[in-house]
Amino acid sequence: MDGIKYAVFTEKSIRLLGKNQYTSNVESGSTRTEIKHWVELFFGVKVIAMNSHRLPGKGRRMGPIMGHTMHYRRMIITLQPGYSIPPLRKKRT
């Protein structure tokens, strides 16, 4: 399992870093317990709570044909005080 795809850096996610909450996009087929186990094992931290939501895909036009991108899942991971995750790399666009 790959788990986390990449970190998300938006105004809201940067504001949540002050509350020890980390935002990242994950595989859409993964569950909360899988991601929680993977984060605790890989980073050596304790997860208190996880919030997730599925974001819709975007429309993409290819000539006269209208297509769309796949939906994806975003998780907000709350850690216990005293724990932190090192900075994740930002996805290149």
Swiss-Prot record:
Keywords: Chloroplast, Plastid, Ribonucleoprotein, Ribosomal protein, RNA-binding, rRNA-binding. It is found in: Plastid, Chloroplast. It holds the Pfam family Ribosomal_L23. SUPFAM superfamilies: Ribosomal proteins S24e, L23 and L15e. One of its GO terms (molecular function) is mRNA binding. Disulfide bonds: none annotated. InterPro entries: Nucleotide-bd_a/b_plait_sf, Ribosomal_uL23-like, Ribosomal_uL23/eL15/eS24_sf, Ribosomal_uL23_CS. GO terms for cellular component: chloroplast; ribonucleoprotein complex; ribosome. Part of the 50S ribosomal subunit. This is Large ribosomal subunit protein uL23cz/uL23cy.
